[in-house]
A protein has these predicted regions:
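Short Cys/His-rich Zn2+-coordinating modules
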Residues: 302-313, 337-343
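Iron-sulfur cluster-binding cysteine motifs and their immediate structural context
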Residues: 318-349, 355-381, 386
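Predominantly flavin-linked oxidoreductase catalytic cores and closely associated redox partners
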Residues: 1-124, 179, 183
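Active-site-proximal substrate-binding core of FAD-dependent oxidoreductases
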Residues: 160-166, 178-230, 340-347, 370, ...
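C-terminal catalytic lobe of FAD-dependent flavoproteins
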Residues: 92, 97-126, 142-175, 181-187, ...
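C-terminal auxiliary extensions adjacent to catalytic cores
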Residues: 224-279
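Flavin (FAD/FMN) cofactor-binding core of flavoprotein oxidoreductases
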Residues: 65, 121-142
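FAD-binding beta-loop-beta segment adjacent to the flavin cofactor pocket
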Residues: 133-164, 287-300, 310-327, 334
Length: 389
């Protein structure tokens, strides 16, 4: 563009990366310096959330968490309903991204969840006024990368500090930020920001409640790989006794769990189409509108498909569908055209910056190099406008 100005270069002796789950720069750092070597790959979940305004009085302080419905027994996740101030409710659905169904759609599952009589008693007759989506790091203790390297530290969700069974992580982000600040201060006083000096950050984390808490529940999420009932039994046993594996292993990248449509075990409850209305049950594009997301159409797309041909020859041919058109909670990806002219159309302006696509994309373009066929980079400008989320 004629008025284009390159971004400002900012130099620092130490940079603290706190970009949230699957941060663009944080993941580059992790892969470039092999910070996850000898540890499990990170496991993620996708959460979608709506704020609903009702006509009757609300239930401030209400907090409901559910497990399962409308998910199959092979999918880890559930819903929630929070009563906010006045006549507002926050309703959402969270699903582990290690599902095997190529047609699974979490936004659609949220609509089905809202149809349940238990949820309807709170939101019936209401209207959606806000929407958002985000991934969560669920891998736990064994998936935490080495959190330091020359001139850099990782904090919060970028490092994977989330306690899955307790649904807590904000206090870990705050504590890791405090410990990172202490480490940076010491490094600046010494005039040495090398990995040798910054390694004290990992020691501080190990002696804090952050890693102690995560170690206690280190095997909880992995137990649900076997299904909901075995997961509850094994996960609960390991969490309350502290027993179970003490070393990393047995965990695969989320995208490797996808299976052909006719082989997926989690399809039994994910085939029924959702029903929509003009208020509380909305389709995906309507939710995108309520997210407030905006991107200038004349900027370079921040989402690219590196090898579009492989979408047809590898992805659709193997899975019987285009998984990205389902797992994206913002309808960024559309399968258009017929026959040999079919292609994936990228509507980058819809993006709500959840990062699901780069985690769940089943095509690894260079075979296990952690470079997926979908490339997501921070846009020049724009994004969702979270309101009350």
């Amino acid at each position: 563009k004629p008025n284009y100005e390159p971004g400002t270069r900012i130099y620092a002796k130490v940079t603290v990366f706190g970009e949230g789950p699957y941060g663009t720069l944080a993941e580059d750092l992790i892969h470039r310096f092999r910070l996850r070597e000898g540890r499990n790959p990170q496991s993620y979940a996708l959460g979608v959330k709506e704020v609903i305004r009702v006509k009757h009085g609300g239930s401030p302080g209400l907090a409901v968490h559910t497990l399962g419905y409308p998910l199959s027994a092979r999918v880890f996740g559930g819903g929630f309903c929070y009563g906010l101030a006045e006549n507002l409710y926050a309703v959402g659905m969270v699903c582990g991204l290690d599902w095997d169904d190529p047609q699974m759609d979490v936004q659609e599952l949220l609509q089905r969840f809202k149809k349940h009589p238990f949820v309807q008693q709170f939101i019936k007759g209401g209207e959606v006024i806000a929407y958002g989506a985000k991934t969560l790091p669920e891998g736990g203790y064994f998936s935490v990368p080495r959190p330091y390297v020359d001139g850099a530290l990782l904090v919060g969700d970028s490092a994977g500090f989330l306690n899955v069974p307790y649904l807590k992580g904000i206090h870990y982000a705050m504590k890791s930020g405090m410990l990172a600040a202490e480490t940076v201060f010491d490094a600046l006083v010494q005039g040495d920001a090398s990995a040798t000096v910054l390694s004290s950050y990992e020691d501080k984390l190990a002696s804090s409640y952050v890693m102690r808490d995560l170690y206690r529940v280190r095997n909880f999420r992995q137990a649900f790989t076997y299904g909901r009932l075995p997961g509850l039994l094994l996960g609960g046993f390991t969490m309350w006794t502290g027993l179970g594996p003490t070393k990393p292993g047995g965990v695969r990248e989320d995208y490797t769990h996808l299976r052909p449509l006719n082989e997926a075990a989690s399809t039994r409850r994910t085939r029924e189409p959702a029903q929509y209305d003009a208020g509380v049950l909305v389709d995906k594009l309507t939710d995108v509108f309520y997210s407030g997301t905006q991107h200038r159409e004349d900027q370079p797309p921040h989402i690219r498909i590196l090898n579009p041909a492989r979408c047809l020859t590898d992805c659709i041919a193997r899975y019987g569908d285009a998984p990205c058109t389902h797992f994206c909670p913002a309808k960024v990806y559309d399968l258009v055209g017929e026959g040999e002219h079919r292609r994936i159309q990228v509507n980058f302006a819809n993006c709500v910056h959840c990062k699901t696509c780069v985690i769940k994309d089943p095509i690894d373009v260079l075979d296990a190099d952690h470079v997926q066929n979908i490339d997501w980079r921070a846009p020049a400008e724009g994004g969702p406008r979270y309101q009350g989320l």
